[in-house]
A protein has these predicted regions:
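Conserved HGGG/HGGXW glycine-rich cap/lid loop of the alpha/beta-hydrolase fold
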Residues: 40, 45-94
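Alpha/beta-hydrolase fold catalytic core
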Residues: 2-54, 74-78, 117-118, 275-278, ...
Length: 306
């Protein structure tokens, strides 16, 4: 595995080893929002008025990850903030059973239909990007356009040896081991030093790292374990040609790994089969690009939202 692939693997998977239950209340968004709507697999709050923009966070991440963009975005848009049950200290709800990703998609579609949000702009970070692609596949009318933030149609390519075409069947046994190992950490304490070690590489800025660690420590490791497993065995590569909604792939790079020269070709290869895709890169950032470079991310997001 080369250094670029290794760093991406760390960015996507490293938080999963540190997640502990710490049931409490999730932090409010930075803009005035409506009351929370609880569903089987997700909860939703809203802010602002205008054309709808749906924001889906990544693995073990609360809706607060979007705090830096919500106030500006809500000036012209109806911002729908999604949070997966079991993250941010929330009750896991139905997410202790298999089928979490499909359940999230089902809940999102129900919310979109009920609230007449068809054709919304959808933004997903990491796991949220995979969910966005799943939603576009299952309910193409729900999405008018899709922004994918540092995510892939098949996460397991990050674990593939050079020259090997990995498949979900090949990954499933290792993914199951990882799921069971992470789920077994539920209720067990972890030191700050271990948490810092496991989250290394996910963000570059000290403030970003502090926020990320605090969020990760509140996630229910049982939910995270199941979502990790489903992430790793979900392969949407063959579905990309059928996704007609325009896709914007936003990816980070930095002076270490991945460099700009490495990142661009990698992401273009992963999304080559998509019929309508554009690319936006943001430098001096890691996986949590919205935390490392909030101004640049907001600029890219508002340009996407229109």
């Amino acid at each position: 595995m080369n250094h670029f692939t290794l760093r991406l693997a760390v960015a996507v998977l490293a938080p999963l080893a540190i997640l502990q239950p710490n049931i409490g209340h999730c932090a409010p968004t930075a803009a005035t929002s409506t009351g929370e709507v609880r569903m089987d697999h997700i909860s939703v709050t809203e802010a602002g008025k205008g054309s709808p923009v749906i924001l889906i966070p990544g693995l073990a991440t609360p809706r607060a990850v979007w705090d830096g963009v919500v106030p500006e975005l809500a000036k012209n848009h109806r911002v729908i903030l999604v949070q997966v049950n079991g993250f941010a200290g929330d009750d896991p709800g139905a997410n202790l059973k298999p089928g979490v990703l499909d359940g999230i998609v089902t809940d999102l579609d129900a919310y979109i239909v009920k609230n007449k949000l068809t054709g919304a702009a959808v933004v997903g970070h990491s796991m949220g990007g995979l969910v966005g692609m799943m939603l576009a596949k299952a309910h193409p009318g729900d999405i008018g356009k899709l922004m994918i933030v540092d995510s892939l149609p098949f996460f397991a390519v990050l674990r593939a040896p050079p020259g090997v075409e990995v498949t979900p069947a090949m990954v499933a046994p290792q993914a199951a081991v990882a799921r069971d190992k992470i789920a077994a950490t539920y209720g067990k304490p972890m030191s700050d030093a271990d948490a810092a070690s496991q989250t290394k590489g996910l963000a570059l800025k000290p403030d970003s790292i502090t926020k990320m660690k605090a969020w990760a420590m509140k996630a229910d490791s049982r939910v995270t374990a199941e979502v990790l497993y489903e992430d790793l065995i979900t392969d949407l590569r063959s579905d990309l040609p059928s996704i007609k909604a325009p896709i914007t792939v936003l990816y980070p790079w930095n002076s270490g790994y991945p460099t700009r020269e490495m990142a661009g070709p990698f992401y273009r290869k992963q999304y080559a089969a998509a019929p309508n895709v554009t690319y936006v890169d943001i430098g001096d950032a890691a996986h949590f690009v919205m935390l490392d470079q909030p101004d640049a991310f907001l600029k890219a997001l508002t340009a996407f939202a229109g």
